[in-house]
Amino acid sequence: MLMNSIYSFTLQELKKELTKNNIKAFVAEQIFDWIYSKHVDSFDEMKNISKENIEKLKQLFSFENMVVDKLQVDKHDGTVKFLLKLEDGNFIETVIMKFNYGYSVCVTSQIGCNMACKFCASGLIRKKRNITVGEFIKQFIIAKEYVEKNFNDKLTHMVVMGIGEPFDNFENLIQFFEVIKQQKGLCISPRKITVSTCGLVEKIKEFADLKNQVNLAILLHAPNNEIRNKIMPINKVYSLDKVIEAMDYYIKVTKRRVTIEYILIKDVNDSDENAVELAKLLKGKLCYVNLIPYNKVVENNYFRSVRGKQFFDVLKKNNIQATIRLERGSSIDAACGQLRIKKILELRNAKV
């Protein structure tokens, strides 16, 4: 029998599940305390739960078997990148970053990615499967424990911008948000969470209707369809005008500002004309642009732009709010998915 992960339930859902199996509802609060405050990953360690109930719990629920295969720490800014091995032998990446407001974690939503953005390492290997709710939560717990142990601090923020397209794993993603905000659990405010999408229009609208206060970032990366078609194949399904229309719907429904992510790629999308066109596209909208320095991926022929400041100045001149993202993880495999690809190639070569 395939058991449900203990990490996949909200407190109320777990209470109902326990009651259904003749275990008192209050045991759910004890379990939450053990797994989210004391960080145990075995029912046998839960000393205030009866042996009879522990045996029942072992038959009903599983713990995520996720281990750190490799750890990289940037020598300049302290960014931490984990390569995590999952129970089925797959690998994912999770990253801890330090900001002036505290520590944030970037989690992975899929094993591989089908969006196939031409500049991205994540899409070099196609999607194998979605990350489960339990695997989402376990990534956060591993990062949380690391921050508490090594930095004597708290992990307070999260972005779902790792490997994969989060909105292509919509059901698990939304349940993850419900679980992580539980007050007697990890208690992460939705306002401290940001999720990104490359532009799955129907899901942007569905996400808007939830009004769950999680922040939205749209990976635009181009000011027109011609450029976006070349670097983001998804644009041939969801064209730029449809993505902007979905963003407008999100803003209207939620009254929340959207982040526009824009990776600057040399001689592709970084000219003054591109900046002017982007400014016209976003004029009057409740959004701001996050300009991102490109991390080179050896498997493709794209390069980092040196025109970040000029591009920023053009946006500013045209009354578009923008920032240039501070580069992090420069001394490690910074590009999303790079560490995973290295591991996969290493394993393939070992078999030859």
From Swiss-Prot:
Active-site residues, as the UniProt record annotates them: 93 (proton acceptor), 336 (s-methylcysteine intermediate)
Key words, A-Z: 4Fe-4S, Cytoplasm, Disulfide bond, Iron, Iron-sulfur, Metal-binding, Methyltransferase, rRNA processing, S-adenosyl-L-methionine, Transferase, tRNA processing
EC nos: 2.1.1.192
Top class in the EC scheme: transferase
Cysteine pairs bridged by disulfides in the record: 106-336
Residues that, per the record, bind S-adenosyl-L-methionine: 164-165, 196, 295
Principal subcellular localisation of the protein: cytoplasm
Positions annotated to bind [4Fe-4S] cluster: 113, 117, 120
Cofactor(s) the protein requires to work: [4Fe-4S] cluster
Ribosomal protein recorded as keyword: no
Subcellular localization, as worded in the UniProt entry: Cytoplasm
Biological processes per GO annotation: rRNA base methylation; tRNA methylation
Catalytic activity: adenosine(2503) in 23S rRNA + 2 reduced [2Fe-2S]-[ferredoxin] + 2 S-adenosyl-L-methionine = 2-methyladenosine(2503) in 23S rRNA + 5'-deoxyadenosine + L-methionine + 2 oxidized [2Fe-2S]-[ferredoxin] + S-adenosyl-L-homocysteine; adenosine(37) in tRNA + 2 reduced [2Fe-2S]-[ferredoxin] + 2 S-adenosyl-L-methionine = 2-methyladenosine(37) in tRNA + 5'-deoxyadenosine + L-methionine + 2 oxidized [2Fe-2S]-[ferredoxin] + S-adenosyl-L-homocysteine
The keyword S-adenosyl-L-methionine appears for this protein: yes
Entry note: cofactor: Binds 1 [4Fe-4S] cluster. The cluster is coordinated with 3 cysteines and an exchangeable S-adenosyl-L-methionine.
GO molecular function: 4 iron, 4 sulfur cluster binding; metal ion binding; rRNA (adenine(2503)-C2-)-methyltransferase activity; rRNA binding; tRNA (adenine(37)-C2)-methyltransferase activity; tRNA binding
Function: Specifically methylates position 2 of adenine 2503 in 23S rRNA and position 2 of adenine 37 in tRNAs.
Family indicated by similarity: Belongs to the radical SAM superfamily. RlmN family.
Extra remark: Reaction proceeds by a ping-pong mechanism involving intermediate methylation of a conserved cysteine residue.
Protein name according to UniProt: Probable dual-specificity RNA methyltransferase RlmN
Organism: Malacoplasma penetrans (strain HF-2) (Mycoplasma penetrans)
